[in-house]
Amino acid sequence: MQTLIQGAGAFIWPLGFCSFLALFLIIERALALRVSKVAPESVVKSVLTGQPELVGAADGESVAGRLVQRWKDGASGEVLKAWARHELIRLQRGLHLLDSIVAGAPLLGLLGTVAGRAALFPEQGLPDTVTLTRGVGLALSTTMIGLCVAIPSLLATNWLARRLEILSSRLDVLVEALEARRR
């Protein structure tokens, strides 16, 4: 492992930063996109059973609770849907950075590969053994680390996007139920 990190040279810093940022974003978004934080069962059940009045101030901490509060304050129709879209945009926070890491980490690895290959060809003659080893090590290490950052980030991004889609569907049902109640 130490050889891999040393072989990556200066490219280890941006790749390490991408790795830590991705880990932070994955954990933070996984915690933020829990059902209990977005659309708790108690709030959804109260609305779907035709009793949104039972949703209390304590439920206002969740996205669904805030939407019910807006409905109680008189928001309806397009206004309520606009608030739901606003909340969904807030839930997407940070996912664009994770997408950038998925795309950028392999490119940083590729840049390291190019730098390693460039080191193989000195201005004159053939490279010596040390230069050859260092260049190949840089090329392989940065590629491997870039992929090791990107692949788990890609899997997490897909999981979070699916999670967001499911929660969005729950909120759509909630808004439609509130709208039907208003009519």
Question: Where do the PLM segments sit?
Answer:
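Predominantly long cytosolic amphipathic alpha-helical stalk/bundle segments
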Residues: 36-127, 158-183
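Alpha-helical transmembrane segments of integral membrane proteins
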Residues: 12-25, 99-106, 149-153
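Pore-lining and gate-forming transmembrane alpha-helices of multi-pass membrane transport proteins
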Residues: 130, 134-157, 161
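Membrane-interfacial hairpin junctions
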Residues: 3, 121-135
